[in-house]
Regions:
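Rossmann-like adenosine-cofactor binding region
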Residues: 51, 66-70, 176, 182-274
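Active-site regions of enzymes building and remodeling cell-envelope glycoconjugates
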Residues: 28-33, 99, 188-196, 280-281
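Glycine-rich Rossmann-fold phosphate-binding loop(s) that bind the pyrophosphate
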Residues: 14, 159-160
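Phosphate-binding beta-alpha-beta segment of Rossmann-like dinucleotide-binding domains, i.e.
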Residues: 97-99, 105-153, 165-168, 172, ...
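Rossmann-like dinucleotide-binding domain for NAD(H)/NADP(H)
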Residues: 97, 101, 231-328
Length: 328
């Protein structure tokens, strides 16, 4: 089969230096890989690139894969997410058109859990604060209140693989752990399943792991942030829009919250100036999921899903039920 005849896989964007792992898997299976810009392009540009390349498979990291993009390639059979969340993919349109949508749910739960606990320790041990102080020429140990993690109540909002891993790590520190999940939580040693209001009212630190969808957008709004203990810490490593940013800014400015650590924002990569102005805010650029090991697994497994579908097999991690798929 000539290069021109091989089915094409289009990778919309990627948060790493190259696409060699993806290329090895895709082209090693006899398909053609075409890469878009590494930085996520606007929806219109992605739609034009899909129209141009007519891919049978799409791999996407952060770029929007809209209904128009999905409808622009009659050959399309799979949209594979290089990640867990599906909020940048028009899943309903893919389903309607008989196209698989996949993700990689297992690859980074340890890293995200590590990141969330690391952010909590940055507050309880004053790591970021004292680093800034020493670099500014100030050696003043009494400028921040430090806390013993074992004495704290930590609430986890969202209790999937990442939430469970976070709970296990917090148990290791001896903290009391509360968890809120929209599904019924089975009894689990070291974890108390409670309602969201109770969790917010009792927790000294709240860690957010819940996925973003229509029901969870602004789940932590002005009313619910007001339920939190005065001086509590809020850590978000899920999706920025789970928290109402303006309400969060107000809670920080008023002193109701003791601090916020955010790996995600509502409109990445734009950072609201009011967040930058708060000394008790820690920001990282959506990298909680990354490590050498997790990125290798992500890229390999996502690419293998595309190959599986293009070979006529069902994916291992399908996240929809494509219309008419049984007839193919």
């Amino acid at each position: 089969m000539s290069t021109a005849e091989r089915p094409t896989v289009f990778i919309t964007d990627y948060a790493w230096p190259d696409v060699e792992i993806e290329r090895a898997v895709i082209e090693g299976a006899g398909f053609k890989l075409v890469a878009g810009p590494s930085t996520p392009a606007p929806a219109a540009e992605i739609e034009a690139l899909v129209e141009q390349h007519q891919p049978a498979g799409i791999l996407t990291n952060w770029a929007p894969v809209t209904a128009k993009a999905i409808g622009s390639s009659p050959a399309l059979r799979i949209v594979g997410r290089l990640g867990v969340g599906l909020d940048n993919i028009a899943v309903d349109e893919a389903t309607r058109r008989g196209i698989w949508v996949t993700n990689v749910p297992d690859y980074c739960f340890e890293e995200v859990a590590d990141h969330s606990v690391g952010m909590l320790l940055a507050f309880t041990r004053g790591l970021v604060h004292f680093d800034r102080e020493v670099r500014a020429g100030r050696w003043e140990p009494a400028t921040a209140r430090l806390l013993r993690l074992k004495t704290l109540t930590c609430g986890i909002v969202g209790y999937g693989r990442i939430g469970r891993s976070t709970a296990q790590k917090l148990n290791g520190f001896g903290a009391r752990v509360l968890a809120y999940t929209r599904s019924s939580g089975a009894a689990e040693k070291g974890v108390e399943f409670v309602g969201l209001e109770q969790l917010l009212r009792e927790s000294d630190a709240v860690i957010v792991h819940i996925p973003l969808n229509a029901e969870t957008k602004h789940l932590l709004n002005r009313e619910r942030l007001a339920w939190m203990k005065r001086g509590a810490f809020l850590i978000n490593v899920s999706r920025g829009a789970v928290i109402d940013t303006q309400a969060l800014i107000e809670a920080l400015q008023s002193g109701r919250l003791g601090g916020a650590a955010l790996d995600v924002l509502e409109n990445e990569p734009t950072v609201p100036p009011a967040l930058l102005a708060q000394p008790n805010v820690i920001l990282t650029p959506h990298i909680a999921f990354t490590s050498d090991a997790s990125l290798r697994e992500l890229r390999q497994w996502a690419s293998e899903e595309v190959v599986r579908v293009l070979r006529g097999q069902p994916p291992k991690e399908g996240r929809n039920k494509p219309a008419g798929i049984a007839a193919r």
